[in-house]
Amino acid sequence: VRAVVLGQDPYHGPGQAMGLSFSVPRGRKIPPSLRNIFKELAADVGCAVPSSGDLTPWARRGVLLLNTTLTVREHAANSHSKLGWQMLTTYVVEECMRAPQPVVFLAWGRPAVKLIAGAKARAEHALGELGGEERAAASAALACKFVLASTHPSPLSASRAAGDLPAFLGSRPFSRANELLSECGEEPIDWSLPA
């Protein structure tokens, strides 16, 4: 895992969700949030706008596409937000925080920002319980974990800042993620998708 894109919950329309946040199967209409992601991708790193909403190539390049909530009732966005999925997704994020390699977390929307901030705070607190070489290794691993937060790419919020969160559009998440990875000696992520 080189980057984690954390969204809110799966698409709630029939045949849209495919297990990767923001992704839809080939041949499906590209949802508005994903259209905004593609708009930012083109503006940020100059990638051609993809013809498909399938983000599988990103997953193959080390991008974990995860939602804070993993299920949803049909036609009812965020309907399963209180079912406890955050315990599992928090565990996954915490494991990524402990990984030895650099990881950039792209937190899109307040629920994603809150979950990642909590996981990072717990990881920092856990350092105090370690000693010697184990603490040094964990501290070094945590030092190369980065959070890029913005509003959600939904048309309802993509172009507006919300408190301390910058607007998604114009936040340059793709180039900034690559800059952070490069600063840690890692290869940048190829964010391109088939046009």
Where would I find each of the regions flagged by the language model?
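Short coil/turn segments at beta-strand junctions that form active-site/ligand-binding loops
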Residues: V1-R2, R61, Q101-V103, K145
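Active-site cradle of extracellular carbohydrate-active enzymes
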Residues: D54-W58
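Short, well-ordered beta-to-alpha junction loops that form the rim of enzyme active sites
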Residues: Q8, T68, A107-P111
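Adenosine ribonucleotide-centric catalytic and binding domains
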Residues: V1-P50
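C-terminal capping/extension of enzyme domains
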Residues: I30-S33, E40-G46, L70-Q101, P111-A195
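A short glycine-rich, hydrophobically flanked beta-strand micro-motif that places a catalytic Asp/Glu
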Residues: V49-S52, V104-A107
